[in-house]
């Protein structure tokens, strides 16, 4: 998810504010940008790997021993990426290149395509919070976390697994934070499948959930 922070306008190429990047803090990095995540590109699967020059040309004894030579970049491309994907179609490559070009030239505001997820998150959070839930990760360097594709919820007195199981009885599916490596109790909710007519349904069901699970 690239620049999906609607608290500020990150859609203007080469103008501040910018998308935060690990590239500001190290010379050794790989940026992985998904076509479907950045552009909501629904075609064939494609992504871009951006490797820093220093990391690309760096040699590692372990890679030399395993692959018989080469730098991180050459091993990553010719051994790892090729073995995992065998490349991708020409049509997807041309589509990705065209979208990147249009976005960089300011002709295509790709964030307009994903703003709906921010609005969905805002509405969903309001429903959950009103019925006794809390946001597990609610803070971003001192500011309220942005509304986007995902958000995290918890319920007092319930573990991640208990909450995930109980919400299934109310038609709500979410991923336990334990499976993501988190040490916090709660769930990761996704905004992608909610339909406009389902907000009222969710509100009604979470009201029943709260009634059946009074907070002590």
Where are these regions (language model features)?
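Short, solvent-exposed loop/turn segments at secondary-structure junctions
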Residues: 1-4, 8, 36-39, 53-56, ...
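Conserved PLP phosphate-binding loop immediately N-terminal to the Schiff-base lysine helix
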Residues: 1-20, 29
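Short, conserved active-site loop motifs that form the nucleotide-linked donor/cofactor pocket
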Residues: 29, 133-134, 172
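Short amphipathic alpha-helical segments
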Residues: 45, 147-151, 185-188
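Conserved glycine-rich beta-strand-loop-beta hairpin in the small C-terminal domain of fold type I
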Residues: 90-93, 97, 110-125, 129, ...
